[in-house]
Regions:
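N-terminal helical cap/lid subdomain that shapes the substrate entry/recognition surface
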Residues: 3-108
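A short, structured active-site edge motif that brings together acidic residues
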Residues: 44-45, 144-153
Length: 153
């Protein structure tokens, strides 16, 4: 039966990349560079991601039109900014922070495992992430996708 399989499609967030540790690390670096007091940046990452499903539900239910994940992440960042001392930053700084999702680090075995699978199969993503987000993440993390199926597909 596996001889009939031609392609393997993967979820990305949490499966291939470590979003929690990546977001926490980059948020900590961002905060330090903007003189923001130390906070629990792991909790920040979790709080930010916890708003993902409610935001997606608004899109699925028609409360919001199709909205790219970059935009949903930015809207959700605004919701938690005050709690983490970020609300007085310029919009451009928050836009910069929002791009951490484009630079998530892979799990230690992800690239090697995907590369091995790629030798036998077409490998790709299936994600709610917009294609630009997924391409940037792949380039940054060295993820060897053959195809990226993102939200616009």
């Amino acid at each position: 039966m596996m001889g009939d399989v031609k392609a393997l499609i993967f979820d990305v967030f949490g499966t291939v990349v470590d979003w929690r540790t990546s977001v926490a690390r980059m948020a900590r670096e961002f905060a330090k560079s903007h003189s923001i007091p130390e906070a629990d940046w792991v909790q920040f990452a979790c709080d930010w991601r916890d708003l993902y499903q409610p935001a997606m539900e608004k899109v699925r239910s028609g409360g919001l039109p199709f909205t790219k994940l970059d935009t949903l992440h930015r809207m959700n960042l605004d919701k938690i900014a005050k709690k983490y001392g970020l609300s007085n930053l310029p919009e451009e700084a928050l836009d910069e922070l929002n791009l951490v999702w484009h630079r998530l680090s892979p799990w230690p075995d992800s690239v090697e495992g995907l590369t091995m699978l790629k030798s036998r199969f077409i490998i790709g993503t299936h994600s709610n992430g917009n294609i630009a987000l997924m391409v940037n993440m792949a380039k940054n993390a060295g993820l060897p996708w053959d195809v990226i199926l993102g939200a616009e597909v």
